[in-house]
């Protein structure tokens, strides 16, 4: 499995050997949201900036922006999410991914947290 990187806004990115990052929200985030009922995904070909609005997730509790942890071009969106948004709750780090990006600035990964740092960050929130 590729290494996971995390943001303080509870997004994750996993980058493959071809420089494609798969992006989603963390298990912590989905638990805070509650049952996800709607997901709006970015368009293929869209250029997104690190920290910029990329997608929307709505739950029974709230609507929330999903920010991109990296800059690049959207190359794929998880087409199954609009029909089955609950995948975000059941498999946030797997089938519940939101979109994939061809990284334009791979060095941005160095500014993100690894699993250990993210776990410590979340531990301070509870």
From Swiss-Prot:
Transmembrane segments: none annotated. Binds 1 lipoyl cofactor covalently. Pfam families: GCV_H. Residues 20-102 form the Lipoyl-binding domain. One of its GO terms (cellular component) is cytosol. InterPro entries: 2-oxoA_DH_lipoyl-BS, Biotin_lipoyl, GCV_H, GCV_H/Fam206, GCV_H_sub, Single_hybrid_motif. Belongs to the GcvH family. HAMAP family: GcvH (MF_00272). This is Glycine cleavage system H protein.
């Amino acid at each position: 499995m590729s290494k996971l990187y995390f943001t303080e806004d509870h997004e994750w990115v996993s980058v493959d050997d071809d420089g494609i990052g798969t992006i989603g929200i963390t298990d912590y985030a989905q638990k805070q949201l509650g049952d996800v009922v709607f997901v709006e995904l970015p368009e293929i070909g869209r250029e997104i900036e690190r920290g910029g609005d990329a997608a929307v997730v709505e739950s029974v509790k709230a609507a929330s922006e999903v920010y991109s942890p990296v800059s690049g071009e959207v190359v794929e969106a998880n087409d199954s999410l609009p029909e089955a948004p609950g995948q975000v709750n059941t498999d946030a780090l797997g089938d519940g991914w939101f979109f994939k990006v061809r990284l334009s600035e791979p060095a941005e990964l160095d500014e993100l947290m690894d699993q250990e740092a993210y776990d410590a960050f979340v531990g301070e929130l509870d």
